[in-house]
Amino acid sequence: MLPAFMHMDVVKDCLRLKKHVITPSYVPDALWALDGEVKAAGLIFLNELGLDPGIDHMSAMRILDRIRREGGRMEAFESYCGGLIAPESDTNPWGYKFTWNPRNVVIAGQGGMARYIKDGEYKYLPYHRLFQQTVRVSVPGFGEFDGYVNRDSLKYRKHYGLGEIPTLLRGTLRKAGF
């Protein structure tokens, strides 16, 4: 696996060489711009196939589809994901097991702006304030964790079929007090 900053170079080479692509990373706008070329070449470029993003999308869609199938409707959507560590494996000061690029774990609070909607109010949280606005999330059987907002939750509104839902937030869990 390559770091995300290298993906566009690899993607362009794969498009030129007619090779399929799979990554665990978010889809940048530059990659969306290649969608027509990828389809015209008969290629499959699959992204967001890690834990988060990835497995979180699949579990969210499974739940949303079941609710819709049973005649329900969503009034709010909040989803948190994280590599929760088994207590017997908690052997480092961070209380965290690196399941992805360690550099990205360290710089997770840097970058652009986290975007989400809460009770009908759009929220924009600069990354330098990300870890100052955590929420406590209880996971039965595992305890309390800190949750913080993930990047741009709003771009998943269409993908999840959530239209004008008043609350849409995707977040990350970390050990309390991380």
Stretches found by the model and what they are:
Residues 9-16, 24-47, 58:
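Rossmann-fold NAD(P)-binding glycine/threonine-rich loop
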Residues 7-8, 87:
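Glycine/Thr-rich phosphate-binding loops of Rossmann-like dinucleotide-binding domains
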Residues 28-33, 51-56, 80, 84-86:
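Short gly/pro/ser/thr-enriched loop/turn and capping motifs at secondary-structure boundaries
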Residues 69-178:
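C-terminal catalytic/substrate-binding lobe primarily of soluble NAD(P)-dependent oxidoreductases
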Residues 57-73:
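Oxidoreductase and adenylate-handling cofactor-binding alpha/beta cores
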Residues 46-51, 140-143:
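Flexible, glycine/proline-enriched loop segments at strand-loop-helix junctions
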Residues 1-7, 22:
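Rossmann-like NAD(P)-binding element
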